[in-house]
Every structure is written in structure tokens, then in C-alpha cells.
Amino acid sequence: MTRVKRGYVARKRRKKVLSLTKGFRGSSSVLFRSANQRNMKALKYAYRDRRKMKREFRKLWITRINAATRMSNMTYSTFIHKLKKANIVLNRKLLAQLAVRDQQVFQQLFSYIEGV
């Protein structure tokens, strides 16, 4: 069996990892072994936080809707219940944007729900 030196292939692989870790602190962007470990850890964090972000944004939307509904003497849960009862299908992201950016429309929605 012939000997394979892997010069070009190994250099290309190491360069790819080092380019991915550009901007990392200390030797994590210079030395291949620590850069490789940092890169794997960064990818794990990215995977985890893509899922975490969805949870945190939903929490933020619910908090904003709750704050807006409590200004009109109603809790978040009763507001959502009355929305479902009135067959109004709006997601929490949209409701939160209405509560923050367009309070008049939110109040109209609120008064419509009260009538039902």
C-alpha cells in the first residue's frame, strides 16, 4: 500500500476550520485543535439557541399582549379565550405588534370582543 501524505487535503480542511473561527478570542482562532473544538461548540450553541429563540419570542409576545390587555382591565387568558370564542384567528406575534405599534386597532379589537 502506498503512503499518502495528505498535504493539500489536510491543509484545506484546517484552513476551512480556521476561517470559520475567525474573530474568536485568543488562540481559538489561531491554533487548529482549539479552533476545531471552539467551532464544534459554537455550532452546538447555534443549534440550541435557534430553538431557544422561538420560546423566548413567544414569551415576549405574551408579555406584551398581557400588558396591553391589563390596561383595559382584562387578563391575557380571558382575552385569548374571547378571541377564540369570537372566531378571530390572529397569532400572538401579530397581536403583540398591534398592542405595541397600533393601539387604536387593538382597542377596536378589544371592544369587538367585549360585544360578543
From Swiss-Prot:
Subcellular location: Plastid, Chloroplast
Alphabetical list of InterPro entries matching this protein: Ribosomal_bL20, RIBOSOMAL_L20_CS, Ribosomal_protein_bL20_C
A single cellular component GO annotation: ribosome
PROSITE patterns assigned: RIBOSOMAL_L20
A GO molecular-function annotation: structural constituent of ribosome
Keywords: Chloroplast, Plastid, Ribonucleoprotein, Ribosomal protein, RNA-binding, rRNA-binding
Keyword Disulfide bond: no
Gene Ontology biological process terms from the UniProt entry: ribosomal large subunit assembly; translation
Protein family: Belongs to the bacterial ribosomal protein bL20 family.
Function: Binds directly to 23S ribosomal RNA and is necessary for the in vitro assembly process of the 50S ribosomal subunit. It is not involved in the protein synthesizing functions of that subunit.
Protein name: Large ribosomal subunit protein bL20c
Protein source organism: Oltmannsiellopsis viridis
Lineage: Eukaryota, Viridiplantae, Chlorophyta, Ulvophyceae, Oltmannsiellopsidales
